[in-house]
Design a protein with these regions (language model features):
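Outer-membrane beta-barrel proteins
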Residues: 1-129
Length: 129
């Protein structure tokens, strides 16, 4: 089924700066297919600083009762700066009480700096007793 949402608010700091923030999202789970897709768009309008827009997408697929794969992407745009971009790919497998998960994550232009990129890998094991 479809899930949608929207939120907004005003933020005022003790220094007197103000910003307006809003976010909206949509997620759709395809019944019987094991497929879920989602998207989120957020915006922050600052009185005294650059505006920021964020767009994220995600997709997951339950291949069978034991195997799932997922992908996510996020872009953070700041006026007058290099876009920060992040991606992640994940896979998980469960066999009885044993679970294993692997993910690869990459972020480019961290803090909008063109020379600040990172990659990371995670491996997780779980045991249920």
């Amino acid at each position: 089924g479809l899930t949608v949402g929207y939120g907004e608010g005003d933020v005022e700091s003790t220094t007197g700066t103000k910003s307006e923030e809003n976010t909206m999202f949509a997620k759709y789970a395809f019944d019987g297919l094991g497929l879920t897709v989602g998207m989120q768009i957020s915006e922050k309008n600052n009185d005294s600083a650059s505006d920021v827009e964020t767009t994220g997408i995600g997709i997951s697929y339950q291949v069978n009762d034991d195997l799932a794969i997922s992908y996510g992407s996020n872009t953070l745009e700041k006026v007058g700066s290099t876009d920060q971009e992040a991606t992640a790919i994940g896979v998980s497998y469960t066999m009885g009480s044993l679970g294993i998960a692997l993910s690869m994550n990459q972020v480019d232009n961290i803090a909008h700096s063109g020379s600040n990129d990172r990659e990371g890998y995670q491996l997780g094991l779980s045991f249920a007793f």
